[in-house]
Amino acid sequence: MNFEDIEDKDGVRFSWNVWPSSRLEATRTVVPISALYTPLKEREDLPPVMYEPVTCKGSSCKAILNPYCQVDVRGKMWICPFCLQRNPFPPHYHQDLSPNNLPPELLPKFTTIEYTLSRPAQIPPIFLYVVDTCVDEDELKALKETLVVSLSLLPPNALVGLITYGTMAMVHELAYADCPKAYVFRGSKDYQPKQIADMLGLNPSNRPIQPVRPGQPMPAPAASKFLMPVQACEFQLTNILEQLQRDPWPVEQDKRPLRCTGVALSVAVSLLETAFPNTGARIMLFSGGPATDGPGMVVGPELREPIRSHHDIDRDSVKHFKRASKFYEALSKRASVNGHAIDIYAGCLDQVGLLEMKSLTNATNGVMTISDSFMTAIFKQSFLRTLGKDEQGYLKMGFNATYDVLTTKELKISGVIGHVISANKKSSCVGETEIGIGQTSAWKVCSLTPKSTLATYFEVVTPAGQALTPNQSGLIQFVTHYQHSSGQYRLRVTTVSRVFQEGGHPSIAASFDQEAAAVLMARIAVFKAEIDDSPDVLRWLDRMLIRLCQKFADYRKEDPTSFQLSPNFSIYPQFMFHLRRSQFLQVFNNSPDETAFYRHVLNDSDVNNSLIMIQPTLMSYGFDSEPHPVLLDSVSIRPDVILLLDTFFHILIFHGETIAQWRKANYQEQEDYANFKELLEAPIGDAQELLEDRMPIPRYVVCDQGGSQARFLLSKLNPSTTHMSGSNYGAGPAGGQAIFTDDVSLQVFMEHLKRLAVGASTS
């Protein structure tokens, strides 16, 4: 079974691809039955289905017609495999229905299918820019240029608006062409949603928005002052952006600028929830520093007050942290309920408060990026890449989605880990065990990209001892309803089947997907760490690994030398070793904002990208061999090679000592050293390929052995050669570089694992 082929076809990877038949046996497999599903996975061979899906008439079922349904061609009926209800086909199916002429949704190759629904969205996508003006002139100039470029990438009918903030928050009127006009909110005041709606002149009544007739794109006349179609206001908005000035409020030498990020976001959320509830929209925040005033304040304006660190948070000695987090969480709930995504683009050397604001992006699946400045390529390319288009010219994003999961009676849903909120849908599919966001079978996802991946966890509920019919299968259906950027609603349906087997059957172990399992367990570990960042999470990971090895490894009791894992389990302990040392669980050397950013990206990434984050890839380039992957180990550092490290967040080219000396002596400029020039260029070309479709854009680092930036590589390597193991000071055996660390190496980690798994004494 090729797991990647299944992923290409259905966008799904399971931890186990044969399932234990009873609840007891399922708990003994340690890693829960779980799936990483990419709802908008790009597939070129999906047929355009321009009609409504056929749904089961069962009162609590509503499953959608799929290839696993039994079809009675003569009686024009189909049997739902989820609830066994007999359903008639709609009349328009009757004419052509035959065993040799089935509709696409019944063909085995279309276990994933996408319906284009007949009802279009009443309102086009909305993009509301929230722009920080408390930045230097050069920063503001670069930011304005990027924002003007972005307007040309939006759909012409998309609604667009602008809020700027510094000491005050200003909502700009786009319909007033004579001169710039804005509504001003005091940055130090905590406004209630009704106050904001009244001050903006929006109708606060809860009347549903009337359908839009062609030629009348403005559903709410009051809001049309602030949100207009790009094609109608591009000139006016470009003028406003180009004339934007730095916040005029004077800043004393020993103070930070007064920055009211909280008020600006509160106004943005209130504007959209009042005028466009339950509609596809994005609030895009461009933050050049931390909030220092008003609600959501992260740090005081006095420079002598440092911004909080992980150590401060652990000691519970942070003045603003809890209040700010609570404020942004309340905003995130209001935005996510209405389907509004919030993106945060940070352009600042210091922290901007991503830790406090993380709920805004985590609850709405917004974009989060970190860059040192708005002038950097990392910011510009990351932002403009989010507005990338497909071959038809539509934005590669879905809006205001709901994600439903159905299961057959043997399975129940434990929960989802990803950037979702619960839709509070109680159904017979909901299980007792809760992993992540549970107690529901549907979730709201405000924004989706073709790479957005959700982790869904299940439990087997069949009691032990209940007989199974031979080759009995369980079914799961993933249903994603979303607003396409073309203005249509679409429904993506994936139905998958897996076989049940008695506990202990060899096919269960053979079906283990160690890559998917590592990522699914990493998401649980990060979810636990978000609640309680303590060593308990590492202990839990270790316990799970030991139990998995005890269950599935071959060994003689109390004999560590006999320990052996089959190939489809053999790399799993290595993944866990690197996960324990990763920036997701080790906060040392990272700011709280960086930790929030790294965890945010992991919780939206597919298997391959997540694995690069957990266990980075390392390529070696030398004179005597073709470029080839090498161990992520200190023994891979040699003076005569170049290494290319990809950690997903960083792409690093590392020159060994000899290579660096030759490069500094400009040997590559001499004709006799053409092969050296080629060697220097090879990793640069490969790095460019990695940068091409990566989002967010990684930081690109070129360094030399012994240089300060070599720390990015050394921190990721397995320290098999340390200052304790080398015979000479600073050099390890076999030519590897000694790493100055007290961390245990993978070899020591594996020795301990073997001892604990086989039950031997560890003394």
Swiss-Prot record:
SUPFAM superfamilies cross-referenced by the UniProt entry: beta-sandwich domain of Sec23/24, C-terminal, gelsolin-like domain of Sec23/24, Helical domain of Sec23/24, vWA-like, Zn-finger domain of Sec23/24
Subcellular location, record wording: Cytoplasm; Cytoplasmic vesicle, COPII-coated vesicle membrane; Endoplasmic reticulum membrane; Golgi apparatus membrane
UniProt keyword list: Cytoplasm, Cytoplasmic vesicle, Endoplasmic reticulum, ER-Golgi transport, Golgi apparatus, Membrane, Metal-binding, Protein transport, Transport, Zinc
UniProt superkingdom: Eukaryota
InterPro entries: ADF-H/Gelsolin-like_dom_sf, Gelsolin-like_dom, Gelsolin-like_dom_sf, Sec23, Sec23/24_helical_dom, Sec23/24_helical_dom_sf, Sec23/24_trunk_dom, Sec23_24_beta_S
Example GO biological process: COPII-coated vesicle cargo loading
A Gene Ontology term for the protein's cellular component: endoplasmic reticulum exit site
List of residues binding Zn(2+): 56, 61, 80, 83
Any one GO molecular-function label of the UniProt entry: GTPase activator activity
Topology in the lipid bilayer: Peripheral membrane protein
Pfam families: Gelsolin, Sec23_BS, Sec23_helical, Sec23_trunk, zf-Sec23_Sec24
Subunit structure: The COPII coat is composed of at least 5 proteins: the SEC23/24 complex, the SEC13/31 complex, and the protein SAR1.
Job of this protein: Component of the coat protein complex II (COPII) which promotes the formation of transport vesicles from the endoplasmic reticulum (ER). The coat has two main functions, the physical deformation of the endoplasmic reticulum membrane into vesicles and the selection of cargo molecules.
Family: Belongs to the SEC23/SEC24 family. SEC23 subfamily.
UniProt name for this protein: Protein transport protein SEC23
